[in-house]
């Protein structure tokens, strides 16, 4: 199987350059200013982890994954997002990459437009500052930076710019070798349980990395979390949040599936 990250990087290096030809950065910034996005407040992603001992579920609106292919090509954020909010999601994660996740920036924009009050996590393979302006324009509360895709200096620079634009930063780690990236100043740490170069999953990665992370950092885990028992084990290991998408999206009613999952977490707890 071709190295997933190699394919991602090859695609992403082209994508921002194409967007810049269509809407140059100066023009995009002008649109952001004109629409008042710089002054418009967004709910804090970090704050959802305050004041509760129960692990929080960030529900993901995802129509496609590299591992599963298309899950639901016709899924609508206006339906799923509202149901997620109704059934207890702490925040909503929205992958905006089309090639690998079938996503668009418009999903984030629509979630804002229909009045979803939860923080929105803009997930993409961000390697260029242009993408941060796209996230701001869309209405994101927070963005994900992936350590393995960036140099330490790139990560610091993108983190600083995201903060200037009023967005929080979630730093995604795959291995202990990336712990140097804590120096970037991200607001939260996301441990991805997938092996970076394959589809293999190992939730024990989160537990191992949790022991190496500072006690006061907010820790979120994603990938392979398919039972409330696993969710509570992660909580015991020091995680305050989990991101779950395809488990819910594969069901006829993702919101109800989320609600049942949260109920079971509390029972197990």
Stretch-by-stretch model annotation:
Residues 63, 67-74, 83-102, 181-210:
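Glycine/Thr-rich beta-alpha phosphate-binding loop at enzyme active sites
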Residues 1-72:
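An N-cap/entry alpha-helix motif that binds or orients negatively charged groups
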Residues 127-139, 174-186, 221-244:
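Catalytic cores of alpha/beta
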Residues 94, 134-154, 191-200, 239-258:
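Glycine-rich phosphate-binding active-site loops on the catalytic face of alpha/beta enzymes
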Residues 105-116, 129, 150-157, 176-188, ...:
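Short loop-to-alpha-helix "cap/lid" segments that border enzyme active sites
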Residues 61-76, 119-127, 170-172, 220-225:
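Active-site mouth loops of central-metabolism enzymes
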Residues 56-60, 91-93, 119-121, 141-144, ...:
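Structural preference for beta-strand elements that scaffold enzyme active sites
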Residues 209-212, 250-269:
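C-terminal helical cap(s) of enzyme catalytic domains, especially alpha/beta-barrels
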């Amino acid at each position: 199987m071709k190295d997933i990250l190699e394919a991602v990087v090859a695609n992403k290096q082209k994508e921002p350059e194409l967007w810049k030809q269509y809407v140059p950065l100066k023009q995009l910034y002008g649109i952001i200013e004109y629409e008042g996005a710089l002054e418009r407040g967004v709910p804090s992603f970090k704050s959802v982890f305050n004041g509760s001992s129960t692990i929080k579920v960030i529900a993901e609106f995802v129509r496609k994954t590299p591992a599963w292919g298309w899950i639901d090509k016709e899924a609508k954020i206006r339906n799923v997002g509202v149901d997620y909010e109704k059934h207890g999601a702490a925040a909503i994660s929205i992958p905006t990459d089309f090639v690998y996740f079938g996503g668009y920036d418009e999903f984030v924009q629509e979630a804002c437009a229909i009045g979803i009050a939860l923080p929105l996590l803009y997930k993409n393979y961000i390697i260029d500052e242009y993408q941060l302006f796209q996230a701001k324009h869309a209405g994101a509360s927070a963005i994900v930076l992936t350590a393995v895709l960036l140099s330490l200096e790139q990560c610091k620079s993108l983190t600083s710019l995201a903060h200037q634009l009023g967005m929080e930063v979630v730093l995604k780690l795959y291995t202990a070798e990336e712990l140097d990236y804590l120096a970037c100043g991200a607001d939260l740490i996301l441990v991805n349980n997938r092996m970076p170069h394959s589809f293999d999953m190992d939730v024990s990665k989160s537990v191992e990395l949790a022991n190496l992370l500072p006690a006061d950092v907010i820790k979120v885990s994603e990938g392979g979390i398919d039972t409330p028992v696993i969710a509570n084990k992660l909580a015991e290991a020091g995680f305050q949040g989990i991101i779950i998408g395809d488990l819910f999206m594969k069901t006829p009613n993702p919101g109800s599936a989320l609600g049942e999952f949260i109920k079971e977490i509390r029972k197990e707890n």
